[in-house]
């Protein structure tokens, strides 16, 4: 029996004693090599859960077992800040530096993972300063380089990875993520974009009412809740969560 990469049991957390809990008796398990989503409306606690996983929050009840070292975790926050004076190709240099890679080693990995469309896209922006390209372009570049070059990582935590990224480049990014999970990497990503969980049979956790439920895919999500259309059911779940915050 394999040991889960991440295991959380009966976790409860509140930012302050007199505030309602963000999580109440939350449990989840993530295995090595999984691509798994985290669905929930803003602010359902997706970012807070990621902060807990990476050790940014410690005042919780319950158990959180990380069966990986700090160097085996790569986390992408929702907001990315880069110096505007950097050229986009220098982002590659920074990631090489953090991962102790030579440019030759990096390009070997990039050539192995990227298809022609990636190189066409990269060539268009690589000499530009980061302030001259869109937020989505910067995000696409950083994620593409991170998942390609962070070879020691076992778990990637991606908080809303495709926010601001055009649909065609979003699809390229998911193809790349599928490649690294096929190689045994684990990707746990948060999203509130419905379609990102319907294009493939992607398992996901649903955050609702301060707790969490796991579904094997969107069909399981529908069948478990006796609904006939995906969007109607999702809206019902998120509506329950939203109205509870108003009471």
From Swiss-Prot:
CDD domains in the record: ABC_DR_subfamily_A
One annotated GO biological process: response to antibiotic
Keywords: Antibiotic resistance, ATP-binding, Nucleotide-binding, Plasmid, Transport
Organism domain of life: Bacteria
Pfam entry (one): ABC_tran
Record domain ABC transporter: where: 6-234
Listed name of the protein: Protein McbF
């Amino acid at each position: 029996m394999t040991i889960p990469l991440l295991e959380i049991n009966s976790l409860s957390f509140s930012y302050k004693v007199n505030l309602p809990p963000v999580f109440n008796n939350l449990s989840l398990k993530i295995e090595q090599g999984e691509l798994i989503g985290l669905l929930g409306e803003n602010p359902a606690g997706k970012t807070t859960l990621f902060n807990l996983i990476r050790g940014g929050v410690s005042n919780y009840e319950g158990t959180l077992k990380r069966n990986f070292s700090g160097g085996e975790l790569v986390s992408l926050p929702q907001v990315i800040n880069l110096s505007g004076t950097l050229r986009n190709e220098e982002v590659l240099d920074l990631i090489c530096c953090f991962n102790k890679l030579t440019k030759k080693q990096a390009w070997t990995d990039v050539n192995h993972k990227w298809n022609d469309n990636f190189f066409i896209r990269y060539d268009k922006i690589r000499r530009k300063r980061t302030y001259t390209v869109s937020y989505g372009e910067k995000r696409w570049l950083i994620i593409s380089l991170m998942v390609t070059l962070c070879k020691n990582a076992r778990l990637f935590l991606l908080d809303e990875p495709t926010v601001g990224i055009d649909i065609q480049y979003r699809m390229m990014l998911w193809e790349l993520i599928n490649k690294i999970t096929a190689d045994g990497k684990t990707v746990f990503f948060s999203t509130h974009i419905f379609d990102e969980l319907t294009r493939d049979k992607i398992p996901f956790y649903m955050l609702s009412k301060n707790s969490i439920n796991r579904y094997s895919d969107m069909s399981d999500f529908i069948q478990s809740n006796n609904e006939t259309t995906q969007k109607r059911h999702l809206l019902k779940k998120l509506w329950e969560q939203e109205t509870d915050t108003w009471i």
